[in-house]
């Protein structure tokens, strides 16, 4: 499975976990050099799973908050802890 943004493969792996309609990739499968931590919002701080959003930056073009990872997931979301999910701007398939 691949995560693609504007013809750029951000992540690729067969080791995918699906939760809530989103596909989560292991960090080892993600082009981390294209991700920059986004500043946390009040809503982010309220998330019970310790969410951290990332901007995807490719070729100097910033796509704000298009990726996220749960840093401290509660039991129901533990299988996706430390894995990256992507918003609808990113095609996953």
Please place each PLM-identified region on the residue numbering.
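Terminal leader/tail segments of proteins
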Residues: 1-93
């Amino acid at each position: 499975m691949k995560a693609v943004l504007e013809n750029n493969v951000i992540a690729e792996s067969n080791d995918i976990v699906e939760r809530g309609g989103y596909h989560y990739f292991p960090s080892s499968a993600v082009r981390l050099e294209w991700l920059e931590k986004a500043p946390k919002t009040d809503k982010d701080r309220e998330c019970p799973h310790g969410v951290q959003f990332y901007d995807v930056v490719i070729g100097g073009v910033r796509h704000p908050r298009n990726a996220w990872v749960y840093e401290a997931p509660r039991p129901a979301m533990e299988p996706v802890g430390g894995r990256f999910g992507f918003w609808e701007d990113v095609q996953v398939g």
